[in-house]
Amino acid sequence: MRDFIVKILVKIGLYKKAVALINYFKQIAQARIVKKYGVETLREADAALTETGHEMFLIFGTLLGAVRDHGFIPFDYDLDVGIVAEGPSEEIHKAMKAHGLKLTRTTYIRTEKGEWITEETYHYKGVGIDLYFFFEDGDDWYAFGPKHHEYKDWKEANATDGFPTVRAYVPQCKFERQDFLGVQIYMPVEADAWCRALYADDYMTPVKNWDLKTHKTRHKWTGERCYRRDY
């Protein structure tokens, strides 16, 4: 039944609007859970990744919230963190599991050498936390940011040509622990430069329905496509 409804919505051009409406209400509910368990989730993920020798830092919307709002962005429905690593490891998986974080999704790019894992999603007490892997490119690091398919629903996209994605570039720098809602979490010492790279120079001004295409950032479209595997 679901697939039939999706096909009808796609055919009449209402699929994206329907998804946006459904996601809006889902995100409101998820934002409440983030406010309740978000800090605890960050603390456990940080402890797990510290045990594996990684500095887990805030990134994307969670970093923006820390810098601009000194907390979670209103209606932020998940957490974004990163590590500089070539991908996941069994050691990371074991540590995250030991701290109560369940692996629920893997995002990857198909290459001639196999799957290039770019991101993993974990859940802790209902809070989703996206772990982005950052790769080196000259004096920069970059992570991949998957976007919605141009016109297909996610199941069809995942089974065919995947999702468009961007490389989000930030300047390499050191990290230092800073207070975030009572917990000491790594943030880039060049947080301002990172936010400008990710959200443009006017990032301190909240923008409703922010669109990457209308802002000058360091996101680069490369033609690469992402796929996801849910658990």
Where are these regions (language model features)?
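Alpha-helix initiation and N-capping motif
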Residues: 2, 89, 188-192
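Helical scaffold of the NTase/Pol beta-like nucleotidyltransferase catalytic core
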Residues: 2-59
